[in-house]
Amino acid sequence: MKNLLCAVMLTSPLLYSTAVFADDAQQLRNTLVNTASLKTDFKQTVTDVNKKVIQTGSGILALAHPNQFYWHLTSPDESQIVADGKDLWIYNPFAEEVVIMDFAEAINASPIALLVHRDDTTWSQYSVTKKQDCYDIRPKAIDSGIVTVSVCFKNSQLTKFNVLDDKGNISQFDLSNQKVITTEDKALFKFVLPENVDIDDQRLKTLN
């Protein structure tokens, strides 16, 4: 969960110039125009530094511009992350807990933010390098917890992304059944607070 947020995913050859990075970032931005909204199934595989599988999972991912995000892990243990553009909600049914965070504070720590952000300020926080059909995204902040996020496309459609964290773990997310968000799907970005759950409102801590 932490890796997804810091990731919900950065070296390049020294011969590449700053201008090349800028061009690669612009190419990625142009490609993401075709991903203004997306709903897809995903399968997650996490391997450690020794390439041993330490976790698997599956669920549903949805993205919409501007700044809307839905993540529902359905197996093996259920969890949800929902961003409505202002607030971000993290729901753990097993712990019966909901954490609420300011969207900008939470999502800006993640290279995945680039999938739903279009503003120059957010993009300036990352370096982008194109490698065939994939783009490696590196946060410029050294304490992000994420080393690289690689997002891959086929025929301009997002097909997978990988997250490499600072412990050497790689989280691979393979996407399938991609489709454009429908009017009915927009309800996914509105979190409905369950009854009888503990609430940890991080927004209040940010303000104080």
Swiss-Prot record:
- Enumerate the CDD domains for this protein: LolA (cd16325)
Q: Which residues belong to the signal peptide in this entry?
A: 1-22
Keyword Membrane appears in the UniProt entry: no
One of the GO BP terms on file: lipoprotein localization to outer membrane
Question: Which Gene3D superfamilies has this protein been placed in?
Answer: Lipoprotein localisation LolA/LolB/LppX
UniProt keyword Iron, yes or no: no
Predominant cellular place of this UniProt entry's protein: periplasm
What's an example GO cellular component term for this entry?
Answer: outer membrane-bounded periplasmic space
Keywords, A to Z? Chaperone, Periplasm, Protein transport, Signal, Transport
Compartments (UniProt record): Periplasm
Q: Which family does it belong to?
A: Belongs to the LolA family.
Record note on quaternary structure: Monomer.
Protein function: Participates in the translocation of lipoproteins from the inner membrane to the outer membrane. Only forms a complex with a lipoprotein if the residue after the N-terminal Cys is not an aspartate (The Asp acts as a targeting signal to indicate that the lipoprotein should stay in the inner membrane).
Official protein name in the record: Outer-membrane lipoprotein carrier protein
What is the source species? Shewanella putrefaciens (strain CN-32 / ATCC BAA-453)
